[in-house]
Amino acid sequence: MPIDSSSILGIISEEDVIRAAISTSATKFGSQLHSTVCDHVKETYLDAVERQKVKKKIDVRRDLSQEQLQLLNDLYPERHIVSSNCERGTHSFAAASRKIETDLLLSRIPKRSWVYDIGGNWATHVKRNDGRKVHCCCPTVDIRDSARKTVRWASIEKYLDEKEEIPPEIGERIKRLQADEDRIYANLKSEKAQPEDLDGKWYCGNRFEDCVFRADRAYAMAIHSIYDIDLSDLANALEEKRIKVMSGTFLFSVDLLLGKKSGTLPTMDGFFEVEDGYVKYGFHNDTNPGYKHNLNQLMKYLTKTFVVAKGGTIYYLELTEQRGDVMFFTMTDATEARMNGVVADESFKCIPIDNKDEVVFPIFEVDQKTDALVFSEILLSRDFVQRAIEYTGRLKPAQLTSDNVNTYLTSTNNTIIIGGSSKKNATKVDATLIQQITTTLIVWTELMNQRQKRVLEKLRMQMKDDVDFMTLAHATFLKMFGKVSYYQRALRCFANWISYVHGADAIQFRNVPLYAEVTDRIKLWKNYAPNQGFVLDLEELDVKIKLHEITEREKRDVSRCIVSGKLGELSSVDNTECGAVLDGKDYKDSRRKTTFEDLLDGEVATNFLDNWCDKTDHFNFSRSDAVSKYAWGMKLLKGVWEFLLPPLHFAPVYVDAEQARIRLNAEIVTVVEHAVTESNVGLTGVEKAEFADAMSFLVGAAKHLEKRKEVAQQAVVEAVEAVRELRKVHSPADVCNAVDLWSAFEKDLDDDDETGTTATIVEKGKAVCDDDVQVVLCGSSSTSSVEEVSKEAELFVETIESQASSVTETSDVTTEVAASSSDESVMSEVPEKSWASVAEDESDDSYYLRSMIISDKVQKSALPKRPDFSKYSTLQQKAKQEALWYLQCKIVSDRTTLRSIIDDHLRGMFHNGNCELPKDSAFLDYTVDNCGTWMYGKPSRPGHSYGVGFSLDTKQRITKCELVKLMWNRDCRGQMNQKPVNTRAFQYLLLSDLSFMMNELVIYRNLQQVVKKKERTKQARITLRDGVPGCGKSTWILNNANPMKDMVLCVGKEATEDLKEKFMKKHKCAESDLKRIRTVDSFLMHDYDKFRAATVHFDEALMAHAGIVYFCADILGAKKVICQGDSQQIPFINRVESITLQYAKLAIDETEYVRLTYRSPVDVAHYLTKKSWYSGGRVTTKNSVLRSMKVVGPRDAKPMTSVHCVPYHRDAQYLTFTQSEKADLYKALRAKGPVEVNTVHETQGKTFDDVIVVRLKTTENEIYPGGRKGQPYEIVATTRHRRSLVYYTAIEDRLFEDISDMQDVMESKLMKNLCSELTKXRFGSKYESILICDREVRVPDVGTPVIIQDFYDRVLPGNSTMDSHFDGYEVSTSDISIELENCTVQPNKNVKVWQDKRGLVPVLRTAMPPKRQNLPVEAMLALKKRNMAAPKLQEAVNEFEVIERTVNRAKEIFFDTSLIDDSEVSTRESNLRWWKRQSTTAKAQLKKETRLLHELDLCYYNYCIKGDEKPKMDRSPQHEYGALQTVVFPDKIVNALFGPAMKEINERIRLALKPHVVYNSRMNAEELNRTVEFLDPEEDFNAFEIDFSKFDKSKTSLHIRAVIELYKLFGLNDLFALLWEKSQCQTKIRDFVNGITAYLLYQQKSGNCDTYGSNTWSAALALLESMPLEKAKFMIFGGDDSLILFPKHLTIEDPCRRLASLWNFDCKLFDFKHNMFCGKFLLKVGDRFKFAPDPMKLITKLGRKDIVDGRLLSEIFVSVGDNYRSYRDYRILEQLTYALRERYRTTEDPTAALVALKKYIFDFKLWASMFNYKGEFVECRVDRNFEW
């Protein structure tokens, strides 16, 4: 007989067969499977042995059994745990576990960090030899703690006795421990018990909260020591000690969360008991006392997720793991969340319950006092219960006795009978509970047997083949009067009323839950709380810095007075000055490094004085006055001496620059006056020669000092003697020139020191003191001849005079940082020159690599090498280094270009003054005239900041070529001179565009100082507002920036000035008050170290290198940088073409898109949208100018062929693409009048009324339209104007074609880009031309009902085969069990009988449910499934905070605040308007009402059910009996009380809504279409269609109060609000027909006067709180339906989780391309959106069977024709095909069915044929709210 292979496979796949086969083969020696299994076992064993070797071994030393050791190894698998069993003690297992826990927690902490061990065993820690530093806080809070301390000291003594050698580290610890103990004990004896008195290094006697021990970067741990520490106190202590992370453990049993009063701790062999708010822990077989702790404090560690310390620090509390009965937890500093804007958080915790195989079993006892049954529950093994049930189920009724069941349960308590043999079971039930278990089982079995008999009886009667008369009569009787007698019903009702539990309700077996849920929500407030440097108030920090500086200055002044005696004549500080008192004004830090003049004047800082006074190996020379005549010579000698002896290292010395400046000015005046009065008194020729020879000798000796030390020393002495003699007979002015020469020479030596070379003797002297005379370099650093020295002396007085009278601010641009403010400086310092730049063949690249400083030498150099970015870890560091490298490359490139221009000049390349020079260069010749003579021509503009000075030798070779800081004088009219002030240092001067500003040089050197500072650990958050041109970026800054706290940086100077003007106008302040509004260059050049700001507003940030943005953020200490920019306009441009930048683009953390422009006309907005350059949808504008762009090309009537074809317009702004075109156009137009010509790049960010863009060249360039980089330039060029733009181009490029195409665009399309209120109006469009072009396409009248039926059957197969006509009858006549709570039923009410009602017979067969009848079962079923099935919110909600935040957002986002009307709502006029809308019946009922207000029960409602069930659009009708909708409505008089006010409020709300926020107040499809007219179908949206379940019934107090607060904005007074809230809280509903009364908490009542409005705004407010609706382009709300459209690029989080956890809404988010709102699809039809009703609902309703006559059929026909009129347009049907396929997940094409449907719904005869009606149409009027 053949064997079926499928049966064999079925047998083989069984688990038992497989196990048996493997077992048989594996145990057979020699088989292949046996060998494989043995090899696998061997490998597994060897792997386990190897893993055990690498684990850390811990000897717990306690006397533990092998089972306990194995349990410890199982609980802590990362450790190899053994025991030497050398110690016995109390609860050994717990002690061993505590030791392992300590080791685990310590292993998670950095080894070199300090650790606070709360309640830790310091005796154990002190004996550690692992280098850890642990401080234990061990307070004595009870006698046991004191005993512990004594035992620990005994263990220390034992350790000392047993150890022959003690490691030095441990020995030092024990010594310190003993010293601290002696001190603590002495303090306690003296009754000193303050925290400071009990403090020690390794342990203290304080609580952790009071511990005064401090350690940097510390951690904390707590091993079973937090039970009695309040969680808040612990957090405060952690914050005070600046602890970021704490770990700990504590005993825990999940039974505590389940509410049990006692339980076991199985792994610890212990137990717990809860008593009077405390939990007691104890251990079995342990004589030691247990522990008692505060249960409430312990529960906080279990339930809390966050805890906020008093200083504002937020600690995140996490239960990391549970090992046995020990719970591990951590507290981590999470304050940064608040900085990132987190204001609320909720967490879900669940603790597993290890009782998966147990059952909750009920047992009963009789109370001896009350003789009542007492119910309790126990946990029993699932196997035990199942075996017991199986046994009792097999017993016959006579055998079902307590004896038999007791015997069985006792004999099989821990054994299982298998095949006649017993097998021991691990679990055993408490024998004392056997009798109670037996009782429950017997009663439960008897109950089940009775139910089985009843089922069998009824089933046998029903299953008979033959039907007799008695059976039918009996069945009829039961159908009519019910199967349950009235007597039994009454008794059951009475039992429910007295809470008498009976039947199966009394005995239920339930499974144990898998986990216990713990929830917690903590509010994170934004209140300022300074804490550990995380939340830093910059203003407070500035105040503290100023106080510190004032204190330091006072210390310095006092130090001057103290050491003046030591210095003797070195100090010039008067006694009166020492006693001066500082005034109370703010101190300005004006310190700078000490120079020569400071030492001579006695301005010596404290740190230098301390070192100086302590030294004895220096010169102690004296002088008669502050300015010694031999001072400079003595400095040189001192330098020689210091060079020969070991060097002295002095700390940096700072002086007050302000005081030094005042003294310097006074001395300059004195020198000038002295020079003038003695102008006729001079040296003789011989004396001058002798003096010059001495100075020349001095300079020569200094130059060769290092090579000839001994010779130089003697030479210096001789030179000093010579100068000393000359000083006696010569004027101070001459000596000053010598000093100046020495200073210049000395400065070169100082530069050499900066390059990193060996220090020279001159710098040694300079480290001690500097000259008091202002250094003025008037010649080359190599000047040494007597003639040049004499020339220098003659020029000195002139230079002093010119500089003293000059008002131009100058600054030293070559020193690293100018110490004194440039605003206060009146003396100019000529740039320093480095020795590294003397050699012509040495490039700046090599110099940069050694010194990181750019020299002043101008020469041709190679670009520096690219930095090694791999050294830097973060993107910000790489960008900053690249920015520095870029600046250096720019400087080197510019200098190379300048040097090339000079070389070309010397080579005779330039010879004609009429021809322009490169870079608008100009040469000044100082060899003929001291004022200089222009060689070729003047520059186009004066005022250059720098020039290039160079001198030539006799062979016309360059001897020196350096950058020079220029000064420009002004005439009496304030106009700048055409020539700069002669520096008299060079023969020629080059001026060029490259040297006009040269900000890069100063910025680079300042940023070098910034780089030296410590890198920030937390980078600023970069936010970009990516806006189209003219979107109001500067206006946004004006409205959001705080000019007193924030920093506003702009790339361009014009933008900065514009912002300053706006701020001055807004804040009524002067420009001097706006120092925080700067250009980026100005900030980095002058004030880079003077300001701090938490928020930086960076205008046009994308035009700057990313590294510059990061530098500004770091310098200011910013937390947030808000960048304004346009991602599509001209970005940062690399001006050094030979290098490639990798990190120039800014890394954005958050981007906000702005696509509304206020500048550009309508055609420009359409042009930008058409080009699709901007993501995020259509670009719209507020500028109503329709057409603004024109073009003139080479083939026009007046062709554009040259620059002379461009017309002149006085007020127009001319733009070109390149600088060369700019120059050509300027030259062509300047003769016609004043003209403004700029490049496109220069005008980015600017606005003009009329713009003329000019392209002169026909050759290609990458920035021209159509070029590789042309897009940004096209955008900027076309978006600068408000009124007009004309593009003159010599070639028909892409911009020419685009503008030409724009002239052909229809006006109606252009108008879609105009953003105004009227374009978004809900009740009509301003531009009627849109409707003219929107013509519908006629639908042919074809098709039959068969096509419709076929489509329906294919989409919803099986629905048409179900006949649900008798479903209501079966439900009403069959037994049904409905459990209801808070509900009563009056059995004396008449019971209705189901009636067979039929109407017209439809042609289509659909799942349209029949009309239900108002029967008790239907009413209770609807109550159960609707009102009683509402979800219950489990989370704790701070309602008032949520409501306040949400309503405030609603006021800003939903409404136009100017239209909000908050006047009185209940007026005579509003009441009359409401009265007129009421029906005649309602008015008659109200007129009969006689109750007064105080007699009304506002909490009483009527209850009924709707007869019509909502049709289901799925296949659920095939297996589900749907519940009817319920209606809960108050009396008419109550609606009359609230109705007028609610109606008025809803009208006010509708009128105050913003255009893009729509309140669907019963709108039809045409009205809905008007609300979406402004939306562009070409724009993609991210649509949110949310379906709420049980919406009305899910309402809580949060919804009710939120809507009330919203209504208060529109005039709802407090009395109405109170009454309305009262009527919605606890309510009683009653069904008079069926005698049902129920009680509801909250819920939206579906029949009150504001059901629709309350539903609408409940949903709207919930969605507003859960989603960023401020970013939505369109939103519409109506009842529980909503549709929200966001720009496509936005990523919006699914709101359903928050809606469920906070707003109690069960919902789901639909992700459809074709969205639906209120049963209508939103379709893209033509050039607009339109709403169209869902045809599937109509097809389903066409199967309705309860249409009774032709009148109702006519009414339905009228209603359908009105609502589905859009079906006449074939375009609608075409889009519906896609929507239906997507919505109903079908591949069927619905086109034919839709066409046939349209044919039958607009012709009454065809419509009537669908219901087999042959009558005529009945004239009727249908209300818009008609439903069928």
From Swiss-Prot:
InterPro entries reported in the protein's UniProt record:
(+)RNA_virus_helicase_core_dom (IPR027351), Alphavirus-like_MT_dom (IPR002588), DNA/RNA_pol_sf (IPR043502), P-loop_NTPase (IPR027417), RNA-dep_RNA_pol_alsuvir (IPR001788), RNA-dir_pol_PSvirus (IPR007094), Virgaviridae_RdRp (IPR047310), Virgavirus_MeTrfase_C (IPR013664)
Asked whether the UniProt record includes Lipid metabolism among its keywords, one would answer no
Q: Which reaction does it catalyse?
A: RNA(n) + a ribonucleoside 5'-triphosphate = RNA(n+1) + diphosphate; ATP + H2O = ADP + phosphate + H(+)
| Residue ranges of every copy of the (+)RNA virus helicase ATP-binding domain listed in the record | 996-1154
Q: Which intervals hold domain (+)RNA virus helicase C-terminal?
A: 1155-1320
Q: Give coiled-coil spans as residue ranges.
A: 701-728, 1432-1496
Keywords, ordered alphabetically: ATP-binding, Coiled coil, Helicase, Hydrolase, Methyltransferase, Nucleotide-binding, Nucleotidyltransferase, RNA-binding, RNA-directed RNA polymerase, Transferase, Viral RNA replication
UniProt EC number: 2.1.1.-, 2.7.7.-, 2.7.7.48, 3.6.4.13
Which residue intervals define the domain RdRp catalytic in the entry?
1581-1694
Q: Where is the Alphavirus-like MT domain?
A: 82-302
Residues covered by region (Helicase): 1026-1289
Q: Which domain of life is it from?
A: Viruses
Q: Which GO terms describe its biological process?
A: DNA-templated transcription; methylation; mRNA modification; RNA processing; viral RNA genome replication
The UniProt entry, under Pfam families, shows:
RdRP_2 (PF00978), Viral_helicase1 (PF01443), Vmethyltransf (PF01660), Vmethyltransf_C (PF08456)
Ranges for the region named Methyltransferase are 61-812
Q: Which family does it belong to?
A: Belongs to the ssRNA positive-strand viruses RNA-directed RNA polymerase family.
Q: What does the annotation say about its assembly with partners?
A: Heterodimer of a large and a small subunit.
Q: What is this protein called?
A: Replicase large subunit
Source organism per UniProt: Soil-borne wheat mosaic virus (strain United States/Nebraska/1981)
